[in-house]
Amino acid sequence: MDINVVNALAYEDFVKLFGNVVEKCPLISAAIWSYRPFKDLADIEARISEFIHSLPDSGKEGILRCHPDLAGRDLQSGTLTPESQEEQSQAGMTTLDSAEIVHMYRLNSEYKERFGFPFVICARLNNKADIVRQLSERLKNRRTAELECAIEEVKKICSLRLHSIVLSDIQTKL
């Protein structure tokens, strides 16, 4: 998809197309639409990043709370967004055995209790062993460091989702 096509999208179509590049946060796409025309995909990413970084910590935490637990209840019940379903599947989270599911549940619960938001990692850039290792390691972080780390992971997820949309056929998304 050409950037000119993106720039020509009506507000409603833009939000529909890009509304889940940050999990369950269409407000971000709605806000950056005002910055059109975008120079390129990197410009869209920069605007999203600027928007996220302009938020107070409570806003950043809100973004993180929109993310599902990895291998959690939403995956088990089939209620993930299509993007999250695909990402967790690619990372091997859909093939965990019952002991691994229990272990992930325990780690996810410990993480949420410690930080107040779910563990976020770019699943498409990791496999299940990496995810478990990172989750265990990041439990040792200070809260402020972990908030920044998790937001950086959100930006990686966003970047990959943006690229997937732009490289796909726009007509199938609208």
UniProtKB/Swiss-Prot annotation:
Catalytic activity: 5-hydroxy-2-oxo-4-ureido-2,5-dihydro-1H-imidazole-5-carboxylate + H(+) = (S)-allantoin + CO2
Keyword Glycosyltransferase annotated: no
GO biological process: allantoin metabolic process; purine nucleobase metabolic process; urate catabolic process
Broadest EC class assigned to this enzyme: lyase
Entry binding sites for substrate: 68, 84-88, 119-123
Entry annotated with the keyword Membrane: no
UniProt subcellular location: Peroxisome
SUPFAM superfamilies listed in its UniProt record: UraD-Like (SSF158694)
Assembly and oligomerization: Homodimer.
The protein, known as: 2-oxo-4-hydroxy-4-carboxy-5-ureidoimidazoline decarboxylase
